[in-house]
Amino acid sequence: MKKVLFLLTALLLVLTACSTARQKLSPQGNVNLKTADVYYSQENVDQAEIYYLKVLEDNPDHVIALRRLGDISLFKAEYFTAREVEFYEDAFEYYSKAISVTENFPELTNQDRIDLRDMRKRKERAWARIYMAAEKEKEAGNTQKAKEIFELAHKLEPDRPEPMIQLKNIYLVDIKDEVKAEQILKQLLQKDPDKLEYLLEMGTFYYNKGNYAEAVKYFDHARVQNPTNVDNLMNISACYYELKDYEKAMIATKTALEIEPNNLDLLENARSIADQMNDLDQSIEYLKRILDIRPNEDTYSILAAHLMQKQDWQQLIKYAEEWYNWDTTNKIAVEYIIWAAQQSGNRLLATKYSEIKNKMP
């Protein structure tokens, strides 16, 4: 941590000299700045903080003092963990102001740009640590404390979706207040109606409540923002499936399969939808595709039943034999082969598998 805090100490004189033309200080202000720099270089953060604050009294926009106070606040947050959120908030505020002041300099130098990159990284770090502190409190079961810290994280970065989504979850899961959870999501969407994360959250909220017609509106809107999001296409399909609009459910699933043709969840969904549509041919095709990727007894069993229903004896023989070769102890597969062979007039094959069946336990 000392390295983080004092890495730039050697540059203090250079930075101070560069800033004087832009950021005037009174004679006493200059004395306070030099005194603060000395204490800072000696790693006496408490005294350095006192004198950097005095510099800000003389010039509230003094970038060097703001940056150093941000660094000191980061240092304190890591060493005084009981007050880490307080110190990370201070660091965030100091860096925010220093960044704002620097960005408004009449002409940015290369050093200014380097400083801005560094300050933005540190500001982001401070915010991330606040968010992580809230997550820790939530995991520990300290709901109220977590709520307060997530609210702070949202106040500091109102455009970041994560804190408000976490607050929604707290109200929904921990506090059991669906009305407040819905209110939070509506507020977020009112502010940014096209934000993908908010649309997905709102759709999920209504889906979990069983309001599939409302849920699909938000998932469809999210699809406009990201047409190739497979998870969202599955959401849309699931909504239409629950609404018994199987044609639309199949359209969404097929679109997703164009993106991920070997996605087993999608193939299973497509097969299930085809069954609901009484479309035996489509169901059979999806079952075959599933078996090409992951042979399993349930899929073989369903496919065999479908092929038997269609009286497609040659295909039934093919897949029942494949089933038997995959599991030579499976008597049902053998019986399907025998039946299909008999129906298709293949006596030799029927005899062969009848003998195999007779030898089975």
Residue ranges and their predicted role:
Residues 68, 111, 122, 132, ...:
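Canonical tetratricopeptide repeat
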Residues 37, 71, 78, 135, ...:
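Residue-level recognition of tetratricopeptide repeat
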Residues 55, 98, 152-153, 187-188, ...:
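Canonical positions in the second alpha-helix
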Residues 41, 75-76, 139, 173-174, ...:
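Register position in tetratricopeptide repeats
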Residues 28-30, 63-64, 106, 127, ...:
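Helix-start (N-cap) detector for alpha-helical repeat units in TPR-like alpha-solenoids
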